[in-house]
């Protein structure tokens, strides 16, 4: 059984047979409309966000399997805040303010993809992404909030 795998980013619920999906899967000889329909069905909850999709096609039978990843952490943070982009000058310009509770929510969504072994550390990883995006957490630089988490200031958030 020879199989080929393609990984691609598509907008949740809005995959089309055009680029970038069409040119990537066209040469595989699988039914493109079935692929598009299944991707749209599986990514409908991530509307407006770029979602990683993995398509594995059996070259002999032309069967395919689609697995959906979670959107990048940056996309989840932006969606949670309801903004288009982070700061264009992180460190000098603040784009928005995020709460530890919001960071925890994103950490739960991304937990399987993160390196952390518990939600506290996963939340700190999400806060690190916020720092890179020019987004404050709890009204201050995310690095300070990470220290506060280490000191136990937000332990009540992680025991919910």
Curated annotation (Swiss-Prot):
Q: What GO molecular function annotations does the UniProt record carry, in alphabetical order?
A: large ribosomal subunit rRNA binding; structural constituent of ribosome
Name the InterPro entries for this protein.
Ribosomal_uL11, Ribosomal_uL11_C, Ribosomal_uL11_C_sf, Ribosomal_uL11_CS, Ribosomal_uL11_N, Ribosomal_uL11_N_sf
Is DNA damage one of the keywords? no
Keyword terms of this UniProt record: Ribonucleoprotein, Ribosomal protein, RNA-binding, rRNA-binding
Q: Which PROSITE patterns does the UniProt record give?
A: RIBOSOMAL_L11 (PS00359)
Q: List the Gene3D superfamilies.
A: Ribosomal protein L11, C-terminal domain (1.10.10.250), Ribosomal protein L11/L12, N-terminal domain (3.30.1550.10)
Basic and acidic residues bias (residue ranges) = 141-150
UniProt keyword annotation of Cell wall biogenesis/degradation present: no
Q: What is this protein called?
A: Large ribosomal subunit protein uL11
Give the compositionally biased regions (Acidic residues): 151-160
Q: Which SMART domains match?
A: RL11 (SM00649)
Annotated region Disordered: the residues are: 141-160
The UniProt similarity line reads: Belongs to the universal ribosomal protein uL11 family.
Q: Which Pfam families match?
A: Ribosomal_L11, Ribosomal_L11_N
| Subunit structure and binding partners | Part of the ribosomal stalk of the 50S ribosomal subunit. Interacts with L10 and the large rRNA to form the base of the stalk. L10 forms an elongated spine to which L12 dimers bind in a sequential fashion forming a multimeric L10(L12)X complex.
Role: Forms part of the ribosomal stalk which helps the ribosome interact with GTP-bound translation factors.
- Gene Ontology biological process terms, A to Z: translation
Gene name, please?
Answer: rpl11
Recorded GO CC terms: large ribosomal subunit
């Amino acid at each position: 059984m020879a199989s080929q795998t393609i990984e691609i980013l598509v907008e949740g619920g809005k995959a089309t047979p055009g680029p970038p999906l069409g040119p990537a899967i066209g040469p595989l000889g699988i039914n493109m409309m079935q692929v598009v329909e299944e991707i749209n069905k599986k990514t409908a909850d991530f509307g407006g966000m770029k979602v990683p999709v993995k398509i594995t096609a059996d070259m002999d039978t032309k069967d395919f399997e689609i697995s959906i990843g979670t959107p990048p952490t940056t996309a989840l943070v932006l969606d949670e805040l309801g903004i288009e982009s982070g700061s264009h000058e992180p460190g000098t310009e603040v784009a928005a303010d995020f709460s530890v509770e919001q960071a925890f929510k994103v950490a739960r969504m991304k937990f399987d993809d993160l390196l952390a072994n518990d939600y506290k550390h996963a939340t700190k990883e999400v806060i690190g992404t916020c720092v890179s995006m020019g987004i404050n957490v709890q009204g201050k630089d995310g690095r300070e909030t990470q220290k506060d988490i280490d000191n136990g200031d937000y332990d009540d958030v992680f025991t919910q």
